Amino acid sequence: MTNWLQKRVRLSPKETALVFEGKEETFEEISEAVERLAGKLFALGIRKDEMIALLGKNDRMTFLLIHALQQLGAVTLFLNNRLTKKEIAYQLANAEVKQVIVADTFEDKVGAGISYSELAETDYKEPELLETWDLSRTASIMYTSGTTGKPKGVIQTYENHWWSAVASVLNLGLTEKDSWLCAVPIFHISGLSIMMRSVIYGIPVYLEEHFDEEKITQLLESGKVSTISVVTSMLERLLKIHGGSYHPNVRTILLGGGPASKTVLEICKQRDIPLVQSFGMTETASQIVTLPPKDALNKIGSSGKALFPAEVKIADDGEILLKGPSITPGYLHNKKATEASFVDGWFKTGDIGYLDEEGFLFVVERRSDLIISGGENIYPTEIEHVIGEYVAVKEVAVIGQPDDKWGSVPVAFIVAEETFDEDELQLICQTNLASYKIPKQIIIVEKLPKTASGKIQRNKLKERHSK
């Protein structure tokens, strides 16, 4: 297939591609800036098929770098800028990264790399850009924590991104007024998928560095944007500061990261806010199941139906299985995990759910014990492994606690030795865990509830802690 950005420039060069900090740039202007940047990367030795890590944020430079690496045919490992130096080091080693490109702000998180300021000073060398893309090639790698606690690198091909964009547009439609407001991280699939859709559809991305509900509300009222991707905590913050509906041009508030509550759905209905609930994951290159507004109140708690190219079914044990061209071919350098994730061509989500008589999907447990905090996936086992390394901890169990701002935050229950010192434990956590993974509360208990086979019952802890 023709290189997407080059094709888009030929189709609609003067249409707006990016709006950042009030400045609009066309696809032609973005393409020229990307080509200049690709030349600098090329001068620094970056070539096709090399694994290049990118540690940036939601800004113009990171946006351009993502495109530039694709133009060169490099594979981009997207690093979460909230991770610790130790967590990042694991991903760099596991992915066998050739080079790291890092925003100046985050230089202390990587041992060595090309900083944005160094890149700016690099001389241009005419790059070898890819005219066409083999859709089976790997475009991006994103690490997702597994229940073992060790992150796995999800392989995302150009085909995955293409079919995700096609599936979405077949469901949501496309108009000449469309533009997508991106206040979710572009190092996450939720943000990267917006960038891919922008080029494939020919629509602008309104990129925001942070989620500021006041500023986002102004944009939603301005008529400039038609679509925004949010997680539950973002939506709830928007609803708190805004009493009415948004501009008529806003036609999709795409919600991921768990279904909305009945209260939220009723507020959206009363205010004529077009909420579209969805279910997806890093492994499905964004949403793969969606619930349109017309079904929202009739199907409270449902994630909807599989998008046109995808299929969903429930295994005998209740696990949600998915099939479709947007699903990852597997995990990087991890044949065992890849094989364990597929059964007869169906991807095993690890989530438990059911389909009602009309084929609507209901997710009962979000990967059983997964904590979703402000859109970030937190696995209790990863935190438990870190806390368990402290010699004064006999046993530990981590659960999610409801939180007004983040949706959910981790809480640790610990069976401790007499020598236990909470300050020491906090230091261990700060060294080994991203800030959002550090337990917001530590509760000392005499024993943890267990099954007959000795497995810790987190559900019992949740029940006890909620009383």
From Swiss-Prot:
Please cite one Gene Ontology biological process associated with this protein: menaquinone biosynthetic process
- Family membership: Belongs to the ATP-dependent AMP-binding enzyme family. MenE subfamily.
Q: Which gene encodes it?
A: menE
> What is the protein's name according to its record?
2-succinylbenzoate--CoA ligase
Q: Which organism is it from?
A: Listeria monocytogenes serovar 1/2a (strain ATCC BAA-679 / EGD-e)
Q: A Pfam family matched by this chain, by name?
A: AMP-binding_C
Entry keywords, A to Z: ATP-binding, Ligase, Menaquinone biosynthesis, Nucleotide-binding
Pathway membership, UniProt:
Quinol/quinone metabolism; 1,4-dihydroxy-2-naphthoate biosynthesis; 1,4-dihydroxy-2-naphthoate from chorismate: step 5/7; Quinol/quinone metabolism; menaquinone biosynthesis
Q: Per the database entry, which stretches of residues form a coiled coil? A: none
> Which is an annotated GO molecular function term of this record?
o-succinylbenzoate-CoA ligase activity
This molecule's function is given as: Converts 2-succinylbenzoate (OSB) to 2-succinylbenzoyl-CoA (OSB-CoA).
> For this protein, what is the EC number?
6.2.1.26
PROSITE patterns noted in UniProt: AMP_BINDING
Q: Which reaction does it catalyse?
A: 2-succinylbenzoate + ATP + CoA = 2-succinylbenzoyl-CoA + AMP + diphosphate
